[in-house]
Amino acid sequence: MTNKNAYAQSGVDVEAGYEVVERIKKHVARTERAGVMGALGGFGGMFDLSKTGVKEPVLISGTDGVGTKLMLAIKYDKHDTIGQDCVAMCVNDIIAAGAEPLYFLDYVATGKNEPAKLEQVVAGVAEGCVQAGAALIGGETAEMPGMYGEDDYDLAGFAVGVAEKSQIIDGSKVAEGDVLLGLASSGIHSNGYSLVRRVFADYTGEEVLPELEGKKLKEVLLEPTRIYVKAVLPLIKEELVNGIAHITGGGFIENVPRMFADDLAAEIEESKVPVLPIFKALEKYGEIKHEEMFEIFNMGVGLMLAVSPENVGRVKELLDEPVYEIGRIVKKENESVIIK
């Protein structure tokens, strides 16, 4: 083993790493926004906070991945939307606290650096950043032979946003009588996929199940997570929202109570929840108890807002999309979430 080839013979292709950087530059350029300083490739990404115009800035950060949805992206060899999932999981969390996303960083670890595939992944990250209004200011691609199989990779992201101190959403303003408004999800989003994969383990993905309205199973399973930033930011700026819950792992039961105090509860009318076909299919083919579905999945509502009754009309006007009045905030007696 010569010194020149030593690293390559251990499974790390440095030249492929350089190629990835060149391939992703055009995608990163799409995410440029006011405040970005420096260029791709520095030791640290820089952002000038003064460019936001926020008077009393509070930085709010979030980090997440996409779980085993990645395994389906690998199985179906479709890698161009999984990056959007990663961005969505992070920015939807920080928008729930009232933050406007400013910038994003990604981390990809793989067993074998395949530049064309990794370009697709980062292109998806960039698309997510564009939808969120966040700049992609840095990242890391780690080739780790022996840690991962050659076809395997993992993806994580980190979002940083800013909120006006007076506009932080921390649940303290949520009150009895507030109306719960649901914003539609695009599908399963990015949680519950260990169960999803078990339910559909014997399917190729090419199937068109009767519940899925003409779509192939793999298309529905890989539908990218909706990013709610541009829909919800105007509501935050006008201080129309008292609480926001991002419905991810743990479904309604775990996530809705995170947006209000311990002495309150959410009373939800199940008949008003816009349940998507994929959830009906999962319940049927997976033989999952109906009540458990609400403990795992978003069931068609990816983001839930708590809004004072007098502000509901203005919120609907600004959203300009179907908005579902699915319940109210009540005084807590026993459970934090009551589904009727």
Curated annotation (Swiss-Prot):
Keyword Nucleus: no
Disulfide cross-links: none
Keywords associated with the record: ATP-binding, Cytoplasm, Ligase, Nucleotide-binding, Purine biosynthesis
Record field: catalytic activity: 2-formamido-N(1)-(5-O-phospho-beta-D-ribosyl)acetamidine + ATP = 5-amino-1-(5-phospho-beta-D-ribosyl)imidazole + ADP + phosphate + H(+)
Pathway(s) per entry: Purine metabolism; IMP biosynthesis via de novo pathway; 5-amino-1-(5-phospho-D-ribosyl)imidazole from N(2)-formyl-N(1)-(5-phospho-D-ribosyl)glycinamide: step 2/2
Recorded family membership: Belongs to the AIR synthase family.
Name of this chain's protein: Phosphoribosylformylglycinamidine cyclo-ligase
